């Protein structure tokens, strides 16, 4: 799963390119119009009052620009940003060290904020609400609590699983925005912008071909652009035309809907081994040699969005669209099952 070209999960190779391609201001940020409008209004209001921005929660599938937006917020507010992640903040002391290093108005960005431990969360509550740290000195009956004042800061939290956030944490965010999958026309603009920055010659048709196979995700679009560039350099004249893009993506085993070998294997497993379903998540995971969480969080969302897979009370079911895409004839009972749910 980690080696999938079309995975929206960040890979080490993405880091350098992401930095060079990442927009710095809201005016440069393509797509997510509602989110941009909301954040822009609150940024302007906070700057007009000379106050830090209220705490912001960004949630949605991976690769849609949550980290980019956090950096844009810092740039628009004219402040510094400190970046960490839920798994990296293991102990309350780790969080206390970060919070005490912030200056007035700074942004603290916590990626995967749903993975913070409960003990760390409890330290975060007064920091978000009262801009203070409650520190316990000593142990036993002689222990006493000391409150340490913090500079007013803005916490920007990002998560792909908003449902795992506790209510006390979620309720302390003043601005909550959901990022959606990108439209093909927005991805075309992103591909063209990235191509200009990277010095890649690409036609409008070539950009569209890459965009429509990018699973609605800018990170995937930029990754595909780089790989198609390599193919064009070796197998063509270096220019990404529609024909070159189609050939390159076929070579990379990314089909016109953005599915790769792993997606097709999952669908074929359900169809060929379990008659199209319904079949349970644990059974599917065992059959494809993946963890259930990987199947549920990585594979299923895009297949469900395309309408090729359905979650029902009895289990997962492949739809007639999945059969047709794989060149198979939908079974009669498959059609009946999907219509019932």
UniProtKB/Swiss-Prot annotation:
Any GO MF annotation of the entry: ATP binding
Residues that coordinate or bind Mg(2+): 67
Region Head domain (RuvB-H), residue ranges: 256-341
Residues bound to ATP: 21-22, 63, 66-68, 129-131, 172, 182, 219
Xref: NCBIfam families: PRK00080.1, ruvB
Family: Belongs to the RuvB family.
Subunit details: Homohexamer. Forms an RuvA(8)-RuvB(12)-Holliday junction (HJ) complex. HJ DNA is sandwiched between 2 RuvA tetramers; dsDNA enters through RuvA and exits via RuvB. An RuvB hexamer assembles on each DNA strand where it exits the tetramer. Each RuvB hexamer is contacted by two RuvA subunits (via domain III) on 2 adjacent RuvB subunits; this complex drives branch migration. In the full resolvosome a probable DNA-RuvA(4)-RuvB(12)-RuvC(2) complex forms which resolves the HJ.
Name used for this protein in its record: Holliday junction branch migration complex subunit RuvB
